[in-house]
């Protein structure tokens, strides 16, 4: 678990404080992504019950080689919590109360097959504050798996938590 403490100045509304806090941490979030091989997207998003629906940081590359560009974050007010396709990256880790790897998927906006790692953030009293996450070009991981050798003729492969194959040079994904 990741715990974060917000020390809100007296008189500042919580929704306004999220925006002020974002200004303070935005560069650190971007630097973290800029120093992570294969990072395509990085985000810090706040619980929409306590913040503006587009508050936080969202930065994305248009290709693996391009610069991160800050964009307007997803508007939470446009989606129901059960809409896994659009906001599952936020609600699934919060509900699990632990960091999770999302299943690999094709991001149609940038045409990159990617995997997401998302960490929920909680206050000391257990209240959900938000999430911090990163989407990574899945080929960065599969290339590492392909380069791994086991003894002289063995090789590595990648499975998910249920044992389904995510990457194997001789077997189709999902078997």
Task: List each model region and its residues.
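Residues that line or immediately flank small-molecule/substrate-binding pockets and catalytic motifs
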Residues: 46, 136, 160
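Extracytoplasmic/secreted envelope proteins and their assembly/folding machinery
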Residues: 22, 26-30, 87-90, 118, ...
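Extracytoplasmic/periplasmic helical hairpin
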Residues: 2-31, 147-149
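Intrinsic low-complexity, intrinsically disordered coil/linker regions enriched in small/polar
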Residues: 139-175
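Conserved beta-strand and immediately adjacent loop positions that scaffold enzyme active sites
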Residues: 41, 115-118, 155, 162
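Conserved beta-strands of PAS-like sensory domains
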Residues: 110-149, 167
